């Protein structure tokens, strides 16, 4: 009874999601209208429609932008949930078309929704050119373009920097992105950075130098924030897709298949052997506890009854394990597709993140670089790495419900670390040796 009431309350809550989202968006639009009426003579919140100072205008613009973001988010929830409910309740709608009361209620609800959406559109129409989104896209474009052409940002006058960056970016679409790993020369990069820093500090054009420093600081701060945000998205979105698809779609489908095929208990022979071993161990434990007096001495019939009950529990446990394993295969596939889609639709962000990671990696001190290289090599390709790879392969097999294959494990351990070690050595002597030769020398000394 409690389960039915819980399911009903959950269903009612989900059915009212579009209405709640629309009401929240409507209230945010009312807040914006209230600010316009009280402080800007019913016009758009801007400097042209009021006589306030810059601080007051900035405050009201920030408030309006927060309300606009809430409206966009709630409208997205409204559209998605309404679409899902319209698809799931299509049959009920067709069955109730002839009911006059239901039809009247639907018409009334549609009129209310139409009026609220119309009011929201009228309010947000004044702010279609969202300053925040425009600033974000411009900053991404400026960072990506300036990373390709650093001289554009540095040489342009302050009033024409963004224009020159955009023009230069359009003219030089074929220029490849130049990361820190590609800026190599005869002298070490750290030595050249020191010379450039001294040159900048003694530059007689101090005003221009200060402006360049401030521009670099702002660009670095924004690049750091954008990189961290993008990395978090790469982690959170696949995990979220994995959990949602597995919980709400895949597990119910696989459970339905197992319920129709009750004879299917184990998805591979290894799981069956584990279950039989566990059941045998339980039966022997009952005999042992009865013999040494730790428990009541059970008759053969009682032992058989206990073992039968335990067999049912083991069956349910391994059926659940099989369901999870099959669902994991498809959930991981959906997660991988989501990961690839994020990468495909974020080319500018990838360039910024690549530059950010290059600056972190190549900005480390030489001992720190050598320490990280030795830690990585010893962990993944060193003497003790086969044990770690064995644990990883067993975990992957258990995650997907695959039987353990010792021959495949040994073959993988014998080949993959060797390939990884070759790639790492190529990177060290192809790139790191030209960028930071002292780090390579430190690595050799520490490794010896």
Curated annotation (Swiss-Prot):
GO cellular component: plasma membrane
Record field: transmembrane: 231-251, 323-343, 372-392, 408-428
InterPro entries given in the database record: CemA
Lipid bilayer topology: Multi-pass membrane protein
Keyword Membrane (UniProt): yes
Superkingdom assignment: Bacteria
Gene Ontology molecular function: any one: proton transmembrane transporter activity
Protein's cellular compartments: Cell inner membrane
Alphabetical keyword list: Cell inner membrane, Cell membrane, Hydrogen ion transport, Ion transport, Membrane, Transmembrane, Transmembrane helix, Transport
Family recorded in the similarity comment: Belongs to the CemA family.
Known function: Required for H(+) efflux immediately after light irradiation to form a rapid H(+) concentration gradient across the thylakoid membranes. Together with PxcL, contributes to transient H(+) uptake following dark to light transition.
Protein name stated in the entry: Proton extrusion protein PxcA
